Amino acid sequence: MGFRYKQVIVARSDLKLSKGKLAVQVAHGAVTAAFEAYKKKREWFEAWFREGQKKVVVKAQNEEELFKLKSEAEKLGLPTALIRDAGLTEIPPGTITVLAIGPGPEEVVDKVTGHLKLL
């Protein structure tokens, strides 16, 4: 069975986070964006959930690139979540760490993130 819906989490490669910290930030993004989809694009959320919740993690160069991707995604009607760290461990409070996009139709999500490299 092919996937028709997916979620992409974009992590900043310039922060050099530990693996554990990165995993937590990606998880925050995935859950927060899924909740946004549940509230605003329920049919996309439900289809994605039924299909097994496909997720892909890719990297962006910096915060500026995350904002650009967020703008592109929102223009296409995709749910997004920009995650700011609480700053309790490795990085200063308020540091933007990841952008989660979707879940949404795979072909729409790919218009925004298809050119990015896997993490």
UniProtKB/Swiss-Prot annotation:
Where does the record place it? Cytoplasm
Matching Gene3D superfamilies: Bit1 (3.40.1490.10)
User: What is the reaction catalyzed?
Assistant: an N-acyl-L-alpha-aminoacyl-tRNA + H2O = an N-acyl-L-amino acid + a tRNA + H(+)
Q: Which domain of life is it from?
A: Archaea
Protein name, per record = Peptidyl-tRNA hydrolase
Q: Name one GO biological process term.
A: translation
Task: Supply the gene name.
Answer: pth
| Family statement drawn from the similarity comment of this UniProt entry | Belongs to the PTH2 family.
